[in-house]
């Protein structure tokens, strides 16, 4: 296995030269596959999702630096899996029935990605005359093909399935009728609070809503030499690093969600002071857990990079209050966050 980079300059250089271009190539492939879907509405939704959500795959591709010579297969897995996540999120958003059975059924594809010996689920069984010309199955196949090349997949598989299931549960509860969301998410936390008893229910929801733990596990599973255990990674990324990740995502969406009357978990904080205190606490817990991982400097840099990648978003830059608060939040990332912040341009390409 090659040396894992441990300074921000090297990570940016390798992302620019290796992982982001490979992610773009994979995204281009799936954009072309989406355009083959015969149904106009489904085709437009699938193609739009690939083009609009490139940032998820670009940032996630940096985990491939943990995979040694197996970078390409890891990125194949990551892009296909993330494309499924984003595609299904779009299908849920556009569905007026708010049927949890439907949401679980389509998200079965994510578990099928991690269970290569299992038959495909009947993903669209609750949708009348829904035909994507095999698009979702092709994405599942790409994930299965990639994991077949991961030497450590058997050891990571159960942990990957567990964090995937948490993500699915969150997606189901987030997309049901509006009045049911908060009670379901509160119950979700009560049933699982032993994972993070000092988190609040909406912070725990954020900790389940990310795919970072899965991609980190996949990278170590893909590596020719196994250096990390799934339990170690899960305890660090789920729910602490993922909590930082999705809280930042909700932070930048505050104004947009307010205007559209959408649930926003950062809005549950009483004021900016409480928000900063909770961000700091969750960040400190994430740092503490990451210190226990192999390649800890790499993981710590990725965490600080999250601040830069999100807080440099145009939604923040164009809003005076968010911009002022972002200047305070980015201090949690220190110098590396500032460096990533000023190199945000490498992640601004579009897929066409």
UniProtKB/Swiss-Prot annotation:
Catalyzed reactions per annotation: (2E,6E,10E,14E)-geranylfarnesyl diphosphate = beta-geranylfarnesene + diphosphate; all-trans-hexaprenyl diphosphate = beta-hexaprene + diphosphate; all-trans-heptaprenyl diphosphate = beta-heptaprene + diphosphate
Keyword line: Lyase
EC number(s) per entry: 4.2.3.188
InterPro entries per UniProt: YtpB-like
Main enzyme class: lyase
Superkingdom per UniProt: Bacteria
Molecular-function annotations in GO: lyase activity
Function recorded in the entry: Catalyzes the conversion of geranylfarnesyl diphosphate (GFPP) and hexaprenyl diphosphate (HexPP) into beta-geranylfarnesene and beta-hexaprene, respectively. Also produces beta-heptaprene from heptaprenyl diphosphate (HepPP) as a minor product.
Similarity-based family: Belongs to the large terpene synthase family.
Protein name: Trifunctional sesterterpene/triterpene/sesquarterpene synthase
Organism name: Shouchella clausii (Alkalihalobacillus clausii)
Gene behind this protein: bcl-ts
